[in-house]
């Protein structure tokens, strides 16, 4: 306290607080500001006063054995930091031909021109240099070797004289992209390090050699920089399918190679004497036109992937995995192979596995067994008819499990013991396209994914006693695909737990679907009129979902209004049409509660027999009312879903037949029954769903 009183003496009467010790207070306030706002300290320099975008979090130690000084760590910038710098300060609204000019202007304001050390980094060597000047127009730094001489070669030893000779040849000029700023605690060179990082990142990740030859009427940042920057960070965050990333890299390499060949050919043609080699020039010009056409095609493909909307519409489905790999079919030499997946296995586990699973399959003495450490590796090695047995353990999968052949995947043990965890966000977890695929006793886990957990593109897939911990969408059953899901548990989807497309067949028996946005989403499109869904739901428990237990997505009445008017103009509605219209317009569906009423009658008779005992009567009545309420709720939920979907499909079928009749096409007037849509819908329980049992979404 004594020290505090000495440092801050009490105010006297008449003193002004803001004038007491003003010099000392100003110094202390500056110290506080410097501590609290270190990154905003201008350091009395015009270069430092330029707006600071991004941050230098810490120093980093250079790789290698040479004792180089620490460097600024600038490679961990966020998307918005780079975005704001390129948009507002480096590029602005420049045209492709003005890019270099705008960058030079930015560097003049943000860069210290001299007095700082750096490491000149190349593929062959690293050497410590001192920057004496910067040529902004050419984006070069004028350097000299630091003392003492520090150099590390990645190939062989390089002497001091060799580096000096190289600098003499380069006239002491080094590209700014190749230098890394040495860390300085004073903060004077923070913005210098950041500016060079922005420059290096731009030319490594954003700029393309052919950009300056593009049309000069568009905004370069909007057309090229923003989509490429977003794509780069989407790839870093694993939000792009791995197949699409590989395709983009391949296209980029092809485009660079063709552009280099085209540029060399164009330079050769411009240097030749047109009179002496006219015939050869004509051949070269034709070849150049072919290269130019190939370049344009490659650039269009690159732009298709770089644009987020076009990438989602045209590229995601192509790279979902189902189209990239062909089914292998039966093994060329015949036979069946059992693939055993295990990271490690005890003798006891091996004995149990042999006794319980391998010996029953060993009717064929030539049966082959292959061992793998990764489920993805095992699936990729499968041919039609193979069996994959996954031993207990946690398996991390980097990539898409693409099942194209009819195989069986079985977890050896309980699902919670056999866990396959998806690493990465961009790929679908499992894609099924085989004629008959069976997966049992396996738990699939997603984290921060942007694609669904299982997608069935075609064929029949069985899920038996599986656990699906979803992230976005759960199981998707595409057109012409079939799913049989039994005794499985699905939860955690931010979208629908299941998506059922028109033309698919889905059988759900004894499953739990819970803690999703919606339980089951049934899609119904106006242009798919003959694709009658086949859905079986028995003894499922759909509960604790945020929205509805079951949602039907169908066109709004406005979309079908013209078709309905045509139907009215063609004549009066028949009885079936009137019934459908009434069901659709009223949207009041009366469930069949005969069984529930039967329960009520029995309950009344039972209570009449207990009239003598008033206490027992009250208890029995309460129990019966509870039982009746539960039965009514379950019966109503099942009946509402069945009735609404039958009515919707009947309506679509009638509209379709009316359209055909106007074209003179007559079809058999087969009555649509509920059995054509639902093989069975009984015993399902719908509990604690946020919006109720059944909902309709109109688009």
Curated annotation (Swiss-Prot):
Keywords assigned: Coiled coil, Cytoplasm, Cytoskeleton, Repeat
InterPro entries assigned to the protein according to its UniProt record, in alphabetical order: Beta_helix (IPR039448), PbH1 (IPR006626), Pectin_lyas_fold (IPR012334), Pectin_lyase_fold/virulence (IPR011050), SHCBP1-like (IPR045140)
One Pfam family in the UniProt entry: Beta_helix
Record's GO cellular component terms: cytoplasm; midbody; spindle
PbH1 repeats: 480-502, 503-524, 532-554
Predominant location: other
Any GO BP: regulation of neural precursor cell proliferation
Stretches of the chain forming a coiled coil according to its record: 603-627
Gene3D superfamilies from the UniProt entry: Single-stranded right-handed beta-helix, Pectin lyase-like
Subcellular location: Midbody; Cytoplasm, Cytoskeleton, Spindle
Biological role stated in the UniProt entry: May play a role in signaling pathways governing cellular proliferation.
UniProt name for this protein: SHC SH2 domain-binding protein 1 homolog A
Native source species: Xenopus laevis (African clawed frog)
Gene: shcbp1-a
């Amino acid at each position: 306290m004594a020290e505090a009183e000495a440092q801050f003496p009490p105010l006297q009467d008449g003193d002004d607080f803001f004038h007491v010790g003003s010099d000392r207070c100003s110094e202390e306030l500056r110290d506080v500001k410097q501590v609290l706002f270190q990154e905003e300290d201008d350091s009395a320099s015009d270069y430092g006063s330029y707006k600071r975008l991004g941050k230098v979090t810490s120093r980093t130690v250079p790789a290698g054995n040479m004792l180089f000084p620490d460097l600024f760590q600038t490679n961990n910038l966020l998307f918005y930091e780079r975005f704001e710098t390129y948009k507002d300060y480096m590029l602005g609204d420049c045209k492709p031909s003005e890019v270099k000019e705008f960058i030079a202007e930015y560097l003049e304001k943000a860069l210290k021109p001299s007095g700082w050390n750096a490491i000149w980094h190349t593929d062959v060597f690293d050497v410590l240099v001192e920057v004496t000047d910067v040529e902004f127009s050419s984006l070069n730094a004028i350097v000299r070797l630091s003392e003492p001489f520090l150099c590390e070669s990645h190939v062989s030893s390089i002497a001091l004289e060799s580096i000096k000779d190289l600098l003499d040849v380069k006239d002491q000029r080094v590209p700014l992209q190749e230098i890394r700023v040495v860390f300085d605690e004073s903060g004077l060179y923070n913005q210098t390090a950041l500016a060079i990082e922005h420059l290096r990142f731009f030319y490594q990740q954003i700029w393309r050699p052919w950009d300056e030859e593009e049309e000069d009427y568009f905004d370069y940042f909007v057309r090229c920089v923003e989509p490429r920057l977003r794509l780069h960070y989407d790839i870093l965050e694993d939000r792009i399918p791995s197949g699409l990333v590989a395709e983009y890299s391949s296209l980029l390499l092809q485009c660079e190679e063709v552009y280099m060949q085209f540029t060399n050919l164009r330079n050769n043609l411009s240097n030749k004497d047109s009179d002496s080699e006219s015939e050869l020039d004509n051949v070269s010009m034709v070849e150049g036109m072919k290269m130019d056409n190939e370049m344009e095609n490659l650039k269009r493909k690159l732009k298709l992937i770089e644009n987020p909307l076009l990438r989602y519409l045209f590229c995601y489905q192509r790279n979902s995995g189902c189209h990239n790999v062909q089914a292998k079919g039966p093994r060329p030499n015949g036979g069946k192979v059992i693939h055993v997946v295990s990271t490690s296995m005890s003798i006891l586990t091996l004995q149990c596995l042999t006794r319980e699973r391998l010996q029953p399959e060993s009717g064929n003495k030539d049966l082959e067994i292959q061992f793998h450490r990764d489920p993805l590796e095992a699936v990729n090695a499968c041919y039609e008819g193979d069996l994959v047995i996954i031993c207990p353990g946690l398996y991390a999968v980097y990539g898409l499990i693409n099942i194209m052949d009819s195989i069986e995947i079985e977890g050896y043990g309980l699902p919670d013991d056999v866990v396959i965890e998806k690493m990465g966000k961009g790929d679908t977890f499992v894609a099924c396209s085989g004629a008959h695929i069976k997966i049992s006793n396996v738990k699939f886990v997603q984290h921060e994914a942007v694609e669904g957990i299982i997608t069935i593109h075609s064929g029949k897939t069985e899920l038996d006693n599986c656990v699906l911990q979803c992230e976005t969408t759960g199981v998707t059953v595409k057109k012409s695909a079939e799913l049989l899901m039994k005794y499985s548990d699905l939860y955690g989807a931010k979208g629908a737990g299941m998506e059922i497309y028109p033309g698919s067949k889905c059988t759900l028996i004894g499953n739990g679907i819970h803690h999703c946005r919606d339980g089951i989403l049934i899609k119904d499109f106006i242009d798919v009129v003959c694709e009658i869904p086949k859905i079986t739901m028995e003894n499922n428990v759909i509960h604790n979902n945020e929205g509805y237990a079951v949602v039907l997505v169908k066109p709004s009445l406005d979309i079908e209004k013209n078709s309905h008017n045509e139907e009215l103009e063609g004549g009066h509605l028949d009885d079936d049409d009137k019934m459908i219209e009434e069901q659709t317009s009223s949207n009041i569906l009366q469930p069949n509660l005969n069984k529930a009423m039967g329960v009520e009658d029995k309950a009344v008779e039972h209570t009449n027999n207990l009239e003598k005992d008033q206490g027992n009567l009250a208890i029995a009545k309460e129990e019966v009312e509870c039982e009746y309420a539960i039965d009514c709720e379950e019966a109503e939920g099942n009946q509402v879903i069945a009735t609404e979907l039958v009515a919707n499909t009947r309506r679509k079928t009638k509209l379709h037949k009316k359209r055909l009749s106007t074209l003179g096409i007559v079809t058999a007037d087969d009555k649509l029954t509920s059995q054509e849509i639902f093989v069975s819908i009984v015993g399902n329980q719908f509990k604690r769903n946020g919006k109720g049992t059944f909902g309709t979404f109109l688009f």
